[in-house]
Amino acid sequence: MSHIFASIEQLPPDALFGLKARFVADSRPQKVDLGIGAYRDENGKPWILPSVKEADKLIHEDPAFNHEYLPIQGFASFVSAAAKVILGDESPAIKEDRLVSIQTLSGTGSLHIAAKFISKFYKKSQTVYLSRPTWANHFQVFESLGLKTASYSYWNDETKSLDIEGYLKDINNAPEGSIFLLHACAHNPTGLDPTREEWVKILDAIKAKNHLPLFDSAYQGFASGDLENDAWAIQKGVEVLETPILICQSFAKNVGMYGERIGAFHLVLPTPDNKPAILSQLQVFIRSELSNPPAYGAKIVSKILTTPSLRNQWKQDLVTMSQRIYSQRVALRDLLVKLGTPGNWEHIVKQQGMFSFTGLNKEQVARLESKHAVYLVSSGRASVAGLNSSNVEYVAKAIDEVVRNTSTKL
């Protein structure tokens, strides 16, 4: 007997998690996972950061540790420390009390809160401009709340570099007051970031058109190994822009606590006016969706950010991860050059962060998976964190084979 839900359309599985499922099911011993964005150590294993281990020990030794509900706004110490790490201790937004912050379910949850806030309260535009390409989930997050999406130029496929001219042109051509999502650092999927000089031009163009900037910061400290450097674009935006600034912050990657869903949403206002009203609306969003955010991860990150010795250890952990990833970029580039693989592979070392936008097309990616058990996202994005000294030569030879034996046309 049929029922009222019998006609619901079945959707295809999520591309990234579908890729992971195929990898897990693959019995070939030489398989390599360059798909999902999670750090791996030199042995290809998940790495619990030393700073996280010590913070976990300290919070469990605290007699006051418990599993009580957090306030709707989140763990206060975490929310405050998270704002300072991304905006800077001396941020005028913090000192002038014109910042509204709330704990979220990592970066995706923060983007969801931002999207909900925009859809309800931003009347100038309901279109979010996303870089071309961008993280695939951006589209779902915004469109699920009724917002429209459009794109702006970012990646030049021919030169494997940033299309800054097209980027600025699209900012200028967008209707005044449009919403622009900006990757703060370690752009996903390209790994290619604007220079500081280019960021100044981008921010000036946004200011001239009175656009609403929305920064997505998922990799602070993970891109360059330096927290301040990776937050530079956001802090410069706070300095020069006159519109509100929305910031979505994740601690999944940079503390390696992917499954704990630790994040924050920050709204920098031009003046402190109406802060209590805005916070009250954000609290209703949280209360109606998850009641209050999870405590454990927030307490770990708070302990790291507010304990000088742990914060210093965390900074070293970030250097360890970023340097290992960069070393694998160099190794892969050098091996491809040594093999004489057709094409120019310098873009691999010019990119930063977890990912490399390899330039491989869908046919080549499919052949890597079927013939060599090397798993990449169909766009050609590779998680460099999945490379190590034991598999990088195998991966280079696999790439060499598919480039030589498939079409170079997309």
Residue map of PLM features:
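Conserved core segment of the aminotransferase class I/II
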Residues: 239-316
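N-terminal "arm"/small-domain region of PLP-dependent enzymes with the aminotransferase-like
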Residues: 2-74, 81-84, 288, 294, ...
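Hydrophobic beta-strand scaffold residues
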Residues: 34, 149, 213-214, 245, ...
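Conserved core of the PLP fold type I
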Residues: 58-59, 64-209, 220-222, 228-240, ...
